Amino acid sequence: MDFHGTTILGVKRNGKTVICGDGQVTMGETIFKGNAKKVRRLGEGKVISGFAGSVADALALYERFEGKYKSSHGNLMKAAVELTKEWRMDKALRRLEALLLVADKENIFLISGNGEVMEPQEDAIAIGSGGPYAYAAAMALLRNTDLDAEEIAQKAIKIAGEICIYTNDNITMEIIE
């Protein structure tokens, strides 16, 4: 049975960085769980993150990312690059199916097993099945309102949940200021 769907969104505005996610886990055509937590703090609370994909794979990657973050003395970009290199080169890790968003006060990165570490051009980035909807909503709100990052993230996930059947509005959020 396949587990599907998630929406994870990162937003930066006015010195505040937010990563939030919905709570829905879908198995086949059934909502399996509505209050899953796909967002967490890492690096002694200095990094916020969210994942899309396999939970077990994401947890394994979080553990490795924390090690890279510590060994890079809190350099988020270096930790992201080092994790990606290891992910690509290790035969067991290569099979892991997850995407990670990681952020600190200044940066948000998307980390993938394809060897990418991407920093968004804009002040928003999203992953998962509802990601395109949340991203579009966040960009519209960033460009046309004075809402703060937290409000933008909440509204964007809520909009994604109204469009994507694999996304709900049970939001988990982590904030760094």
UniProtKB/Swiss-Prot annotation:
Description of activity control: Allosterically activated by HslU binding.
Keyword Hydrolase: yes
Reaction equations catalysed: ATP-dependent cleavage of peptide bonds with broad specificity
One record GO biological process: proteolysis involved in protein catabolic process
GO cellular component, one term: proteasome core complex
Keyword Translocase found: no
One Pfam family named in its UniProt record: Proteasome
Main location: cytoplasm
Keywords: Allosteric enzyme, Cytoplasm, Hydrolase, Metal-binding, Protease, Sodium, Threonine protease
Catalytic residues, chain numbering: 6
GO MF: metal ion binding; threonine-type endopeptidase activity
Subcellular location, record wording: Cytoplasm
EC number(s) stated in the UniProt entry for this protein: 3.4.25.2
Annotated residues for binding of Na(+): 161, 164, 167
Family per similarity comment: Belongs to the peptidase T1B family. HslV subfamily.
Subunit-structure text: A double ring-shaped homohexamer of HslV is capped on each side by a ring-shaped HslU homohexamer. The assembly of the HslU/HslV complex is dependent on binding of ATP.
Function: Protease subunit of a proteasome-like degradation complex believed to be a general protein degrading machinery.
NCBIfam families recorded: ATP_dep_HslV, PRK05456.1
Protein name, per record: ATP-dependent protease subunit HslV
Organism this protein belongs to: Petrotoga mobilis (strain DSM 10674 / SJ95)
Annotated gene: hslV
